[in-house]
């Protein structure tokens, strides 16, 4: 309803969607067009099964979730958007696959832990944007949870040169930036590293 009401496209966060296994669900990111129709969805591929020794945190997403097996992107009236979710950010191969589909922008909902976010969040987003010459928009959950877990926040928009266009650190809010597709095309033409890759 909100997409239709405000005439906007929405890349929603993740919701649990039934999978082929009765006891597990997919962590699914859904895209709505400005008419409120679901036009794309992506099942998170990389599940967060880690031990963070420094903070005594343990996560086992694979206990509850089934991993997805395919990339997802969608054509919009303004650009081609690729989808990723949270821990996917640590796997450059996913973004290279998306890049091979000529995406212009990655949209990624996330909930990095406070510890890993402080160390890696901005570096990884900028690296993925630079190495694929893409815009990157990530909505990031931040703050304390009832369980005591703390997430890092820092929703941000980064351009293909790795510059932060807008950021909101650790609170609710909205960030807005202009995506300049012509500038991106010129950058890809003048700095054609994607055409130079050998492996």
Residue ranges and their predicted role:
Residues 12, 28-31, 72-74, 155-157, ...:
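Short beta-strand scaffold segments in enzyme catalytic cores
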Residues 47-48, 143, 183:
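Active-site/binding-pocket entry motifs
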Residues 10-17, 51-58, 136-140:
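Short Pro/Gly-enriched beta-strand edge/turn motifs at strand-loop
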Residues 182-199:
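A short C-terminal boundary segment appended to hydrolase-like catalytic domains
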Residues 1-11, 80, 86-175:
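CN hydrolase (nitrilase-like) catalytic-core segments centered on the catalytic cysteine
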Residues 20-101, 114-118, 123, 189-193:
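Active-site catalytic loop in hydrolytic enzyme cores
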Residues 37-40, 163-165, 184-186:
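Short helix-loop capping/hinge motifs at secondary-structure junctions, enriched
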Residues 17-20, 144:
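Short glycine/acidic-enriched loop and turn motifs that connect beta-strands
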């Amino acid at each position: 309803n909100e997409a239709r009401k405000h005439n906007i496209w929405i890349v929603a966060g993740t919701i649990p969607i039934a999978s082929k296994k009765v006891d597990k669900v997919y962590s699914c990111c859904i895209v709505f067009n400005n008419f409120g129709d679901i036009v794309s969805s992506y099942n998170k591929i990389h599940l967060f099964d880690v031990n963070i020794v420094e903070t005594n945190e343990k996560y086992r997403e694979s206990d509850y979730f089934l991993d997805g097996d395919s990339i997802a992107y969608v054509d919009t009236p303004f650009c081609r958007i690729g989808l990723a979710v949270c821990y996917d950010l640590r796997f450059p191969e996913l973004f290279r696959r998306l890049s091979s589909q000529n995406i212009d922008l990655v949209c990624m909902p996330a909930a990095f832990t406070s510890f890993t976010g402080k160390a890696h969040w901005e570096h990884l987003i900028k690296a993925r944007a630079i190495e694929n010459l893409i815009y990157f928009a990530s909505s990031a959950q931040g703050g304390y949870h009832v369980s005591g877990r703390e997430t890092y926040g820092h929703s941000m928009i980064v351009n293909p040169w790795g510059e932060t266009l807008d950021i909101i650190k650790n609170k609710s809010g909205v960030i807005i930036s202009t995506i300049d597709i012509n500038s991106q095309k010129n950058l890809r033409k003048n700095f054609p590293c994607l055409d130079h890759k050998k492996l």
